[in-house]
Each structure stands twice: as structure tokens, then as C-alpha cells.
A protein has these predicted regions:
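Short hydrophobic/aromatic beta-strand element in the GNAT-like acyltransferase core
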Residues: 3, 38-39
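Short, low-order "capping/linker" segments at domain edges
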Residues: 91-98
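Short amphipathic alpha-helix segments
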Residues: 20-29
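A short, glycine/Asx- and small/polar-enriched loop/turn
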Residues: 46-49
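An amphipathic, aromatic/His-enriched active-site/gating alpha helix that lines ligand/cofactor pockets
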Residues: 28-37, 54-88
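Active-site-flanking beta-strand signature of metal-NTP-handling nucleotidyl enzymes
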Residues: 1-9, 51-53
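Short beta-strand micro-motifs enriched in acidic
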Residues: 42-44
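Short, surface-exposed ligand-recognition loops at beta-strand->loop->(often short) alpha-helix junctions
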Residues: 9-20
Length: 98
């Protein structure tokens, strides 16, 4: 299984909007419950840098673009960014969830 790690830094004046939009996005994920997806969002200590970790099970097409709130978040993020996002592919070596 692979993962996408995305690091984004937003302009400080948009941080509250980002946080509100992240909550709306996760509410939509809870409603839609897409299978085979692990999606996590983190805010770093500086308050303006965010990490997203996306894992999609092998053999599954990414279902997130079919969710309107995900598309809206992606579109709005373009205007909130202070710098281009940094995406990186990662290989999952272990993943424990209780």
C-alpha cells in the first residue's frame, strides 16, 4: 500500500477558514464513508502548515473526487496557499490502529 503525504502552508489570515473547511470535509467523509480510504489531516505547531496523509487500498480508484466537499476544499485551498503544496509518495511499512 502506498500513501500520499501532502504538506501545505497557508497564509495566516486563512488558517481559520482552512480549519472550518477541514471540519466540513471530514463531516462529508463520515456521511459518505468511502471504502478503502484512510485520510488524516494534521496542523503543525506553527499554526499555518498542514499535513494530509491519504492511503487508498490497492486496486481501488480514489473515491474522494466524487465528494463535492472534497472538490470544494481542493478548489478553495488554491487561494489559501502561501506557497505551492509539497506532495510526496510514501510506502507504508506499518500501520497500527486500535
Amino acid at each position: 500500500m502506498t500513501a500520499m503525504v501532502l504538506r501545505s502552508t497557508v497564509r495566516s489570515e486563512y488558517a481559520p477558514e482552512v480549519e472550518t473547511a477541514v471540519k466540513a470535509l471530514f463531516a462529508a467523509l463520515e456521511r459518505h464513508r468511502p471504502r478503502g480510504v484512510r485520510y488524516a489531516s494534521y496542523r503543525l505547531a506553527d499554526g499555518v502548515t498542514y499535513l494530509v496523509v491519504l492511503q487508498i487500498e490497492d486496486g481501488i480508484d480514489n473515491p474522494l473526487p466524487a465528494i463535492a466537499e472534497f472538490r470544494e476544499f481542493q478548489e478553495n485551498l488554491k487561494g489559501w496557499l502561501a506557497a505551492p503544496p509539497i506532495p510526496e509518495q510514501a510506502t507504508v511499512l506499518g500501520d497500527y490502529r486500535s
